[in-house]
Amino acid sequence: GSLQVRGDISATMEVRVTGDVVVNGTMEAALVEAGGNVTVKGGIIGMAEAMQDNPGASAAATARTAHIVCGGDLKARFIANSIISAGQNVEVEREIRQSSIAAGGSVNVGAPNSQQTAITGGHTRALKSVRAGTIGSPAGVPTLVQAGLDPHADIKRSALTRKRLKMNEEKAKLEQLLLFLHSHPERATGDVVERARNTHTKLGRDLIQLDEEEAQLIRDLQPLHEATIIAARRFCGGAKIQVGNKQQEFLEDQVGGKAALEEGQIVIR
């Protein structure tokens, strides 16, 4: 079902629904998982130190980060120190600050051509396009913005690689067991050989299926050539953009424009 929250979602709360979530207030460092859309009429605000790259604070830091996973669109007034994964678009009114965003569609901050909005710090990834007034900040905060690769397929690919390793280990162990039982038939009590063979056959089938999933992912990871990144006002020094597989770093502030791929290179117009 769907859920309407009259006030705020406070820190450490966990919300899981199959439909949509609408929050009339703000959302702190909580967890929201929704099958549909998530709308936060206030802002989404994790705690400031949570997203800093401090390996020692990783578990505690995750607890202080706002975390949203939704199948549809995510809409909010602003997003700070949050981890967001949306199946479709991420629409923000004012600013995305020090957050990790993955969108299966586009990320838009403010209305088209609005000068006052910004993406500052963090890592923002979308399949189709990313748009804001300013990308980066005058203080030179490292900011990475990517468009043209499916962010979810990228995350999924690492998960599949781990799964394959585990399955291959299991298969090798079973093969050793079957060899051992073949040379010591007296140790093969009950239906142990049959069970091991069945499991081995099933693993073989699962690995073939994994190959198919990986092949599909590689197709999904083909860069989208019409992807764009737009900064209506400016790209700041310290920002890095990636369109498809091409990257460009800004060493100093540059007037805004639309970055796209032309003949395999990033061109800003």
Predicted regions and their residues:
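Intrinsically disordered, low-complexity terminal regions
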Residues: 40, 45-269
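Intrinsically disordered, low-complexity linker/loop segments enriched in Gly/Pro
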Residues: 1-12, 16
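Polar interaction faces of repeat-based domains
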Residues: 21
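Flexible glycine-rich active-site/ligand-binding loops centered on an Asp-His dyad
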Residues: 25-28, 36
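Short helix/loop capping segments that flank catalytic or ligand/cofactor-binding pockets
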Residues: 13-14, 25, 133-134
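Surface-exposed loop/turn segments connecting beta-strands in extracellular beta-rich domains
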Residues: 8, 24-26, 43, 95
